[in-house]
Every structure is written in C-alpha cells, then in structure tokens.
C-alpha cells in the first residue's frame, strides 16, 4: 500500500471520509439490516468488501480505538473485524461497502447507481491520498494500520 502523498502530515486528513459517511446516513435506504452477520462471513459468501485507501485508514482508526494494533485472519474465514460476540468491532468506522451491502433477507444489495456520487468521492479521495484503487478489506486495513503507525513516528 502506498503511503499518503504528504509525508509531512502527522496523519492523513480523514474528514472527507467522515463527510461521505454522514451524507450516506442522510439517505433513506429502503433496506433493513437483520444483523445476521452473514455478509461478514467471507468464506461462506465468497464476497469480500474492497476498500479505498481513505476507507482503510478510517477503518484502521477504528481498529486502534478498539485497542488493537493489528488484525488477524479469522480461522473461520469471517471478517477479521467481526468480534467473537458476532458484532463488528469497528462499527462506527465500518467501510462504505459494509454500510451499503444488505443480504437478501434485508432487501438485497442497494443499487450502486443510487450511491455513485459517494463512490466517486471515495475514489477521488483515494487518488488524492495516493491510493491505487480498492483492495480487499483484510489487506487494505492491515496495510493501513502500518501506514498509520508510520505516520505517528
């Protein structure tokens, strides 16, 4: 993972990620999460969320806030951010895909065409931060934890 473009910063400014997520929260999505965590079971579903650099850095902030310095693979193939209690350990910092992906029981995936403007903002931020496009969650967050650690030095 590339480091953020401005190495002089103590840490990348993630306020745009926060703004994008706040804009998403203002939209009424005709879906209702059933909290089954099926979508968090990557091996079971065969689907892994992809994160831009901004999303990964924001998620890494949540990982650190939960008291961890790294993420470890889940032996059952679930999201490494899924807690033993079945809840997301970084819920407030969860990625865009986790905020917009809904299983069939909840109404299915929300059409991306209704979220295209927010996705474009995440992609523009990725470019601004020096990212190279979306990457699988475990890799992106793991690398972001390394970047955040380097920025603190």
Predicted regions and their residues:
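Short loop/turn segments that flank or connect secondary-structure elements
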Residues: 1-153
């Amino acid at each position: 993972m590339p480091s953020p473009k401005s190495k002089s910063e103590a840490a990348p400014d993630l306020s745009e990620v926060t703004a994008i997520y706040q804009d998403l929260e203002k939209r009424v999505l005709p879906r209702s999460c059933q909290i089954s965590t099926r979508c968090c079971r990557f091996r079971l579903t065969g689907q892994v969320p992809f994160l831009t650099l901004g999303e990964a850095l924001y998620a890494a902030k949540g990982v650190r806030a939960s008291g961890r310095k790294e993420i470890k693979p889940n032996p059952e193939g679930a999201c490494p951010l899924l807690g033993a209690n079945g809840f997301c350990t970084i819920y407030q910092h969860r990625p865009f895909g986790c905020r917009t992906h809904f299983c069939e029981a909840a109404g299915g995936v929300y059409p991306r065409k209704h979220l295209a403007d927010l996705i474009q903002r995440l992609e523009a931020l990725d470019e601004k931060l020096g990212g190279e496009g979306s990457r699988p969650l475990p890799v992106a967050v793991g690398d972001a934890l390394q970047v955040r650690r380097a920025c603190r030095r």
